[in-house]
């Protein structure tokens, strides 16, 4: 079985995690701050995470998505040797490493675009970008395409074989130097699909179990997630449904999305596929801020770790960190501060560890058992094993789901005969396996 099917991800945005959100001056000596991740490996393992998805780590102008050099670790984080040490330490502890592949666009200081700015149409790299007659917002003497109108993000010409080869060669270096296990493709919905097919062939040639996950927002995710392109995509449909269902006290919303995606009907869209599921990330408000009632953190995390998909937790959110997107992106990407374990971290740890060891949760089918506005229960089943998840967004409630047998709540150690009524406290959850 591919490793990613049993993965539980910890998502780190390195420039924020290391407190390096200031613009790159391109002159300072490398800092070595990325090595701080090594110190947190015991805590990451204790939380039950067996994979890390790193946001951008390569030299960039400011935020990492404005790449300057795909072959060099950002000096604000450290050196290539520093990052290799981090990856080696993670692998020695059984933790997979996934990097952010930002291939749709680069920063204005990207070496090839700088050469174009200097020599204009004479540049051998002019066809690496989408250039036109006219002028740019930066008075370059030519017009170029920026990503969604952001001209500090220069669109690469992915139809150019030289550009595609440069990207593939960069990935080859990352596999050789850092032994990475996969990529998250930034704005995958913008990428040429023939490029995605070529990229998949190259990555699977480098490593047979290499994981490709794409950032997608709307539409039919099968456009990108299929045997010719990506293994997985970001499940933004359920991201919205998760927090909205708790805020509106309407479990029907998230249940509708999960049934639509993974139910038993032939028309269900993604049954048997592994989408990346999350409650927050570096682009959106923290879940503790999004929830109207923070006492809902436990049941929403229980739902995340028991619904179909690959769960991911954004660094700091395991402690209930807050940050509002309306206050700017930097607040979403705060420096990591070591904290003592809390009731929430211990709760997430139990869920994460159980998820990685439970085949019903990793690859099992989904069957809805109970649904009301405030309460939701479902079963995950695989080869005779059953896991039952009970989510209570309301006041104290007793579930009657009609499944026989004695089951153990992995969160409390209590046992129940599920053919009888099962009490679940307000704003809480139970996750059962056969006793």
For each feature predicted by the language model, list its residue ranges.
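N-terminal structural segment of carbohydrate-active enzymes
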Residues: 1-96, 104-106, 111-115, 149, ...
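The substrate-binding groove and active-site-proximal loops of carbohydrate-active enzymes
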Residues: 15-34, 66-80, 149-164, 181-190, ...
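Active-site-proximal helices and loops of the catalytic beta/alpha 8
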Residues: 117, 186-269, 323-350, 380-384, ...
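Carbohydrate-binding surface patches
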Residues: 369-403
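Aromatic- and acidic-residue-enriched segments that line the glycan-binding/catalytic groove
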Residues: 30, 63-74, 103-141, 201, ...
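Core domains of carbohydrate- and sulfate-ester-processing enzymes
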Residues: 93, 111-153, 241-264
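C-terminal beta-strand-rich structural cap/linker in extracellular carbohydrate-active enzymes
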Residues: 417-435
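Aromatic/acidic polysaccharide-binding cleft in carbohydrate-active enzymes
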Residues: 227, 273-295, 300-342
